[in-house]
Amino acid sequence: MRFLEAAEAFLSSGRDLLPFAPFPAATDREAYEALPDALKQEIVAEGEKVLGFPYPPIHATDFMAFRRTGNRINYEDIYFGRRYALNSLVLAECVENKGRFLDDIINGIFVLCEESGWQLPPHNSYIRNTPQEILPDATRPVLDLFACETGAQLACICYLLKGKLDEISPFITKRIFSELTHRIYEPYLKEHFWWMGEGEEPMCNWTPWC
């Protein structure tokens, strides 16, 4: 039974899902106050290092460089730098709970949502072991390990900080849901990617993580 068939069967069974709570949301102050003081200080200090983070732009030619020269480092330095900074800001806000990291978090959310593709240039293909496209097709997302990781990152931010973000504007989390639907849910359910495994197709570490 394929995933979509199994999901439809479960939903039609009338059974309820258990509340999703993999870790404490920012509203659970008891959980965050219970952290060791040294750890809280370290988390806030890491967030302070990236206050005002400029989120450097990724140019189309940065993506194109992999096909042209084989260089993936320049693109990935910017790509992962954005995500690491955003993670530090989110954790710092969860611990401190004063709102001073929120503007930079919102900037980071929209920067990620406005990327043309979440996949890395070396993974920009739909069939395994075929040449990568030189640019991402924003109308047909590719699900690679890091596209799925970006989706998970934004989903976790929404889970952790939804209340705070919605107080500023409901359009922040609405944008996250929109991007997750277009970039993650729909291609996962409607497309077949080589790492999914079907019949004799080989699977890999991407299979469980994606």
Each language-model region and where it sits:
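Generic hydrophobic, helix-prone segments enriched in Leu/Val/Ile
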Residues: 44-48, 73-77, 118
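Amphipathic alpha-helical segments and their boundaries
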Residues: 61, 68-75
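Generic structural "secondary-structure junction" signal
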Residues: 65-68, 120-122
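Low-complexity, Ser/Thr/Pro/Gly-enriched N-terminal "stalk/linker" regions
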Residues: 1-22, 29-66
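Aromatic-lined, polymer-binding surfaces characteristic
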Residues: 29, 76-210
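A generic structural micro-environment signature
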Residues: 49, 69, 124-126
